[in-house]
């Protein structure tokens, strides 16, 4: 069933699954405010729930260690800034996805902590949060609007995901200011990896979550629950920094996929 990123549809789908008396539900529902409502439906029906990426009360969480993923990206961004960016007139910009709630926002918290841990001089930099809704278009518009009024000469940017990172990058390219920035993404999604392969890109990295491996791992957790074996309240995936230098090593099949894709 597809929730279509729509809280009303998510609730209707939950009602259907409860009526069907399923044995277990694996739920990807991204609106934090609806999570208690959806979780309560399953709890009242005694249906165990695995919540993917966004916590639901009483559910087993499966997904990112958001703070750790943020630290990985932030430390890399801090190392880059230390080598390339003097701190004067540098602004830190963090592109958020507010509706996903507090846990995904910990990616941004981790990035900010990681940057300053590696490069303490950034303690004095201005920090701005922009709402990009995790989407390229909205992040492009938010960044485009911001740089019109910002007095910063350089930008160090941490994004909640790769579409947001790319939206910020496209806005800076449009303004002719891409050389004044360094951008860190999250997810190492296909579009992010494609940008990492672009010569001279200012997307200096992204943190991989490897969703292509989720299926087998989630099924293993589901079977443990159904067989009443002990399961931790949260099962975290492993993260890895992906950069222009190692993207082909970590994702060697990307070029093969592109080479065999049909042209339209």
Which functions belong to the PLM regions below?
Residues 88-91, 123-125, 179-182:
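Short acidic capping loops at alpha-helix termini that bridge into adjacent secondary structure
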Residues 18, 77-82, 147, 218-230:
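Short, hydrophobic alpha-helical segments
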Residues 103, 115, 210-264:
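Hinge/cleft segment of the Venus flytrap/periplasmic-binding protein
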Residues 50, 158, 182-184, 207, ...:
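Structural detector of well-ordered beta-strand residues that form the stable sheet scaffold
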Residues 199-208:
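Rossmann-fold dehydrogenase core element
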Residues 11-19, 23-44, 111, 128-195:
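Hydrophobic alpha-helical
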Residues 1-10, 31, 63-73, 94-114, ...:
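Hinge/beta->alpha junction and helix N-cap segments in small-molecule ligand-binding domains
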Residues 32-68, 91, 189-198:
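Flexible loop/hinge segments that line or gate small-molecule binding clefts
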């Amino acid at each position: 069933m597809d929730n279509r990123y729509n809280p009303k549809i998510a609730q209707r789908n939950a009602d259907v699954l409860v009526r069907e008396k399923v044995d277990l539900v694996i739920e990807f529902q991204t609106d934090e405010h609806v999570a208690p409502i959806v979780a309560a439906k399953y709890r009242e029906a005694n249906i165990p729930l695995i919540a993917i990426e966004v916590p639901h009360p009483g559910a087993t969480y499966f997904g990112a260690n958001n703070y750790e993923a943020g630290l990985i990206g932030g430390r890399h961004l801090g190392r880059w800034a230390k080598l390339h960016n003097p701190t004067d007139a540098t602004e830190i910009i963090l592109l958020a996805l507010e509706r996903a709630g507090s846990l995904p926002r910990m990616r941004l918290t981790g990035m900010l902590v990681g940057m300053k841990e590696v490069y303490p001089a950034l303690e004095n930099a201005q920090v701005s949060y922009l709402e990009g809704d995790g989407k390229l278009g909205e992040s492009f518009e938010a960044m485009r609007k911001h740089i019109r009024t910002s007095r910063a000469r350089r930008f160090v940017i941490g994004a909640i995901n790769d579409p947001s990172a790319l939206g910020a990058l496209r806005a800076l390219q449009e303004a002719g200011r891409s050389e004044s920035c360094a951008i860190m993404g999250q997810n190492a999604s296909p579009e992010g990896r494609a940008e990492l392969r672009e010569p001279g890109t200012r997307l200096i990295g992204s943190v991989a979550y490897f969703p292509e491996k989720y299926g087998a791992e989630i099924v293993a957790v589901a079977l443990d629950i159904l067989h009443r074996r002990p399961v931790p309240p949260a099962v975290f995936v492993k993260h890895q920094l992906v950069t222009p230098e190692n993207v082909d090593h970590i994702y060697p099949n990307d070029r093969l996929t592109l080479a065999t894709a049909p042209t339209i």
